[in-house]
Curated annotation (Swiss-Prot):
Biological role stated in the UniProt entry: Part of the MsrPQ system that repairs oxidized periplasmic proteins containing methionine sulfoxide residues (Met-O), using respiratory chain electrons. Thus protects these proteins from oxidative-stress damage caused by reactive species of oxygen and chlorine generated by the host defense mechanisms. MsrPQ is essential for the maintenance of envelope integrity under bleach stress, rescuing a wide series of structurally unrelated periplasmic proteins from methionine oxidation.
Chain's gene name: msrP
This protein's UniProt keywords: Metal-binding, Molybdenum, Oxidoreductase, Periplasm, Signal
Classification via InterPro entries: MsrP (IPR022867), OxRdtase_Mopterin-bd_dom (IPR000572), OxRdtase_Mopterin-bd_sf (IPR036374), TAT_signal (IPR006311)
Leader sequence segment: 1-42
Segments crossing the lipid bilayer: none
Location relative to the cell: Periplasm
Species for this entry: Gluconobacter oxydans (strain 621H) (Gluconobacter suboxydans)
Name the record gives this protein: Protein-methionine-sulfoxide reductase catalytic subunit MsrP
Classification lineage: Bacteria, Pseudomonadati, Pseudomonadota, Alphaproteobacteria, Acetobacterales
Length: 312
């Protein structure tokens, strides 16, 4: 495997470092005063910079937490923040089953106290042609999958979210056309890639409800809809699993969903992206989209010999 080189975010993606450090200092002070707990809106995580973290800081916290796609809480970008307040992310259990020798049942509250939590500052590219840079805190998915000891016949990983219509009003909206629960999938080698993260927090705090609490998938070289939120079950399979958006519109949303500026969505271009949180004298800032979202050196070999226009 090639030596990892962290992709350097573009200047337009980055906010001043002192703003982020100031925020982390305030968070630490709150923890020292005992101001947060495991069930508070945002609890401090004991995290450390991971091997794939950069020294630059992300999109403003307000944008990251108030511009979201999470259809379980509604179709609008502001709906997740306003409609998720009654959602209870704890207690929570994560199951890893299927083609494994050692099925795993994890108490997420224990995961939140894990010393293995790393900070990873990643680009996030939405299929809707907008982007952010987000400081995730989480555990490499490969770490948990290895604990389950995958069977040699396993080729894919299926992810399933939770169904709680009483707490997730979007699950009662027939207009969405979505068959709940939300489901996603990866090839096993994609899931085991060092970049793939099971995120438990952002900005050094537990995930807000609107960002996928208590845990979500982060695959930075793929479009954001692959990042399934509020994961309840993970299963290892010997075949490609169905996925929500591919099932809804297979001509628009492929199974792989790798960021590719040369393959347009049928209804819009993917060549450029609108940078959330960045402004200029001429309005919203746009920048060129990078192949594999800038992570090609780390993941391109996964797709060697494949037709990426066909396998989009």
């Amino acid at each position: 495997m090639a030596l990892f080189r962290y992709p350097r975010p573009l200047p337009s993606e980055i906010t001043p470092r002192d703003m982020y450090l100031s925020r982390r200092s305030l968070i630490g002070g709150a923890a020292a005063l005992g101001a947060v707990s495991a069930t508070a809106d945002a609890a401090t995580l004991q995290t450390h910079p991971g091997p794939y973290s950069g020294n630059l800081t992300p999109t403003p916290h307000e944008d990251v937490t108030h511009y979201n796609n999470f259809y379980e809480f509604g179709m609008g970008k502001a709906d997740p923040a306003t409609q998720s307040q009654t959602f209870h992310p704890l207690p929570w259990t994560l199951e890893i089953t299927g083609l494994v020798r050692k099925p795993v049942r994890l108490d997420v509250e224990q995961l939140l106290r894990s010393p293995a939590i790393e900070e990873r500052i990643y680009r996030m590219r939405c299929v809707e042609a907008w982007s952010m840079v987000i400081p995730w805190d989480g555990i490499p998915l490969a770490t948990l999958l290895k604990d389950a000891d995958p069977d040699p016949h396993a080729t894919h990983v299926a992810f399933e979210s939770i169904v709680r219509p009483a707490e997730m009003p979007g699950q009662t909206e027939a207009l969405s056309g979505i068959q709940w629960p939300y489901v996603e999938g990866l090839r096993l080698d994609e899931a085991m890639n060092p970049l793939t993260l099971l995120a438990l927090g952002i900005y050094g705090e537990t995930l807000p409800n609107q960002n996928g609490a208590p845990l979500r998938l982060v695959v930075p070289w793929k479009y954001g809809f692959k990042g399934i939120k509020s994961i309840q079950r993970i299963r290892l399979l010997d075949h490609e699993p169905p996925t929500t958006w591919n099932r809804l519109a297979p001509d628009e949303y492929g199974f792989y969903a790798n960021v590719n500026p040369q393959v347009d969505h049928p209804r819009w271009s993917q060549a450029t992206e609108r940078v959330i949180g960045a402004r200029s004298l001429f309005g919203a800032t746009r920048q060129p989209t990078l192949m594999f979202n800038g992570y090609g050196e780390q993941v391109a070999d996964l797709y060697r010999g494949m037709d990426l226009r066909k396998n989009f």
